[in-house]
UniProtKB/Swiss-Prot annotation:
Name of the protein in question: Transcription and mRNA export factor SUS1
Taxonomic superkingdom: Eukaryota
GO cellular component terms given for this protein: DUBm complex; nuclear pore; nucleoplasm; P-body; SAGA complex; SLIK (SAGA-like) complex; transcription export complex 2
A UniProt-annotated Pfam family: EnY2
Highest classification ranks of the organism: Eukaryota, Fungi, Dikarya, Ascomycota, Saccharomycotina
Subcellular location: Nucleus, Nucleoplasm; Cytoplasm, P-body
Complexes and interactors: Component of the nuclear pore complex (NPC)-associated TREX-2 complex (transcription and export complex 2), composed of at least SUS1, SAC3, THP1, SEM1, and CDC31. TREX-2 contains 2 SUS1 chains. The TREX-2 complex interacts with the nucleoporin NUP1. Component of the 1.8 MDa SAGA transcription coactivator-HAT complex. SAGA is built of 5 distinct domains with specialized functions. Within the SAGA complex, SUS1, SGF11, SGF73 and UBP8 form an additional subcomplex of SAGA called the DUB module (deubiquitination module). Interacts directly with THP1, SAC3, SGF11, and with the RNA polymerase II.
Length: 99
């Protein structure tokens, strides 16, 4: 691992810590969960997971996740992705402004 990689990991850890300590992680996470619920995404992913488990005759978490995750991610609406990304960007801008 290069010094630049280590520095990037340290910066990421600091940002994550600040995100949690400031309460922004919980706010953003709750907002995302509510949006996904309102849009029916959670029900869609549950159905997709159930179908995958039945079709593949497996309950192995890693295998099911590998099959379901790409489609589940693609099912998130552009509006939800944009809204959450804007909240994350605003959080990062606040961090940069305070340093």
């Amino acid at each position: 691992m290069t010094a630049k990689d280590k520095e990037a990991l340290e910066l990421r850890a600091q940002i994550q810590q600040h995100l949690v300590e400031s309460g922004n992680y919980e706010r953003i996470s709750n907002k995302l969960a509510q949006r996904l619920l309102d849009e029916g995404w959670i029900d869609q992913v549950k159905k997709l997971t159930r179908e995958t488990m039945e079709d593949d005759n497996t309950t192995n978490f890693s295998e099911v996740l590998k099959r379901v995750e790409p489609e589940a991610v693609s099912l998130v609406s552009a509006n939800t992705k944009n809204e959450i990304m804007q909240q994350i960007k605003a959080f990062l801008c606040d961090i940069l402004d305070t340093q």
